[in-house]
C-alpha cells in the first residue's frame, strides 16, 4: 500500500484553507452576535432625537427645482439602502461594547484578517447621526462606533485613531492617523451634540476638544510633501469651534496642491481628488459664500470629465477605493451643476448600485450621496433651521 507524502506547498495550502474557514466561522459568529444584541437593545429605553430623520436641508432653497423632486419616493429608497448598509457592514466587536464598519479582508501569513478604516468609521458616525429617528437606538450605536476608534489609538498621536484597525485581534497594530478621517470624526461629534445633547459613556465636549487639538498638532508636524485631501467643508466646521489660523492656512495650501490634479486627469477621480471634490460640493451646498465661487469653475470642469465615464461601478480605481465611492463623491457638486438630467441619472445609478461585500467605504459614500440627493442633510450650526420633510 502506497502513501503519498504531503509536500510543503500542500501543507501551506491546507493551512490557508483552514485559516479561511476560521475567518468565515468567526465572521458568522460576529454577525449573529450583532443581530442578537440589536434585538435586545431595541427593547431598551430609546433616545430622543432633536433632528429626527428626515429633515429638510438648508440648501434646498438654492435648488428650487430639486425641492420638488420626489421626496417621499427617494426617502423610501434611502431608508432601504441604510438598512442594507447596517445589516451588511456593521458588526460588534469581540467585547460587545464596540462596533465597527467591516472593510477588506487581508491575509497575514496563514491567517485572514478583518479590517476597518478610521475613514469608514468616521462616515459611519456621521450616517448614524443623520439617519437617527426619535426613539431609535442610533445613539447607542454611535457610542460603540466611537468606542472602537478610541480603543485603536494612532502611532505617535494617541488622541487620534489608527487609520487601519483589525477588530478581531485582541490587540491591533498602531498605525499612523488618517487626518481627513479625523476631520469627519470631529464633524460627527459636533452633529451628535446637536442631535442628542450628550452621550452616556463619553463626554462629547472633552472628546472633541482633545481630538481637535491633536489634529492641529498633527497637521503642524506633517510634511508639506504628503498628499492631503482638500477639506474646506470640514475644516470650516471645526474652525468655528476651535479658532486657529492654521485651518485657513491648511485649506489654502491643500487647494494649491489640488489644482494641477484637477486640470490634468480624466475619468472618475481617484481617492484624493474624489474626496476633495466631495468637500468642494458640500462647501458649495452649505457655505456658498466661503470661497466656492473661486473654485467652482475648475471643479465643474473636472466633474464633467468624471461624469463622461459611463463604465460600470464595479471594481476599484485604486487599492481600497472603489468606482462606486468615486462617483458618490461627485454627487454634491453635481447638484450645484443644476442639470436635472444629470442628477436624475446619478440617482438612478446609485440607487441601483450594489456595493461589494468588502466595500464599506463605497457603501458609506453612496449613502452620503443619496442623503444629499434626498435633501435631508443638516449641519449642527450656521444654517437656516430646517423644516422636517413629511414622509407620509
Where are these regions (language model features)?
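Extracytoplasmic mature domains of secreted/periplasmic and thylakoid-lumen proteins
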Residues: 165, 178-191, 197-227
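Alpha-helical transmembrane segments
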Residues: 24-32
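Long, repeat-rich segments with strong aromatic
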Residues: 248-341
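C-terminal functional modules
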Residues: 321-390
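Well-ordered alpha-helical scaffold segments within catalytic/enzyme domains
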Residues: 56-71, 122-137, 184-201, 230-243, ...
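Low-complexity, Ser/Thr/Pro/Gly-enriched N-terminal "stalk/linker" regions
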Residues: 41-119, 130, 134-172, 214, ...
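Short, strongly hydrophobic alpha-helical membrane anchors
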Residues: 1-11
Amino acid at each position: 500500500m502506497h502513501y503519498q507524502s504531503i509536500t510543503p506547498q500542500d501543507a501551506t495550502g491546507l493551512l490557508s484553507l483552514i485559516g479561511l474557514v476560521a475567518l468565515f466561522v468567526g465572521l458568522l459568529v460576529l454577525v449573529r452576535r450583532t443581530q442578537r444584541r440589536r434585538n435586545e437593545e431595541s427593547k431598551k429605553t430609546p433616545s430622543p432625537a432633536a433632528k429626527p430623520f428626515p429633515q429638510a436641508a438648508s440648501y434646498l432653497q438654492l435648488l428650487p427645482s430639486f425641492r420638488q423632486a420626489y421626496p417621499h419616493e427617494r426617502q423610501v429608497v434611502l431608508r432601504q439602502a441604510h438598512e442594507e448598509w447596517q445589516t451588511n457592514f456593521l458588526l460588534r466587536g469581540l467585547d460587545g461594547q464596540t462596533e465597527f464598519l467591516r472593510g477588506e479582508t487581508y491575509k497575514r501569513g496563514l491567517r485572514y484578517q478583518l479590517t476597518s478604516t478610521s475613514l469608514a468609521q468616521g462616515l459611519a458616525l456621521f450616517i448614524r447621526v443623520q439617519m437617527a429617528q426619535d426613539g431609535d437606538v442610533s445613539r447607542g450605536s454611535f457610542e460603540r462606533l466611537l468606542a472602537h476608534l478610541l480603543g485603536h489609538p494612532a502611532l505617535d498621536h494617541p488622541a487620534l485613531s489608527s487609520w487601519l484597525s483589525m477588530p478581531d485581534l485582541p490587540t491591533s497594530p498602531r498605525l499612523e492617523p488618517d487626518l481627513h478621517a479625523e476631520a469627519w470624526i470631529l464633524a460627527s461629534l459636533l452633529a451628535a451634540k446637536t442631535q442628542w445633547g450628550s452621550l452616556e459613556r463619553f463626554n462629547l465636549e472633552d472628546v472633541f476638544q482633545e481630538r481637535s487639538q491633536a489634529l492641529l498638532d498633527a497637521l503642524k508636524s506633517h510634511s508639506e510633501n504628503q498628499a492631503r485631501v482638500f477639506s474646506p467643508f470640514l475644516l470650516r466646521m471645526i474652525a468655528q469651534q476651535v479658532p486657529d489660523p492654521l485651518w485657513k492656512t491648511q485649506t489654502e495650501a491643500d487647494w494649491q496642491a489640488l489644482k494641477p490634479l484637477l486640470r490634468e486627469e480624466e475619468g472618475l477621480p481617484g481617492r484624493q481628488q474624489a474626496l476633495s471634490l466631495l468637500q468642494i460640493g458640500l462647501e458649495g451646498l452649505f457655505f456658498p459664500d466661503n470661497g466656492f465661487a473661486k473654485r467652482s469653475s475648475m471643479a465643474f470642469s473636472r466633474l464633467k470629465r468624471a461624469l463622461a465615464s459611463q463604465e460600470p461601478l464595479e471594481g476599484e480605481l485604486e487599492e481600497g477605493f472603489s468606482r462606486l465611492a468615486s462617483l458618490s463623491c461627485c454627487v454634491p457638486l453635481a447638484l450645484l451643476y443644476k442639470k436635472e438630467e444629470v442628477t436624475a441619472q446619478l440617482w438612478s445609478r446609485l440607487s441601483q448600485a450594489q456595493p461589494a461585500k468588502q466595500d464599506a467605504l463605497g457603501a458609506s459614500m453612496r449613502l452620503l450621496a443619496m442623503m444629499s440627493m434626498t435633501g435631508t442633510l443638516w449641519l449642527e450650526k450656521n444654517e437656516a433651521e430646517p423644516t422636517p420633510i413629511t414622509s407620509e
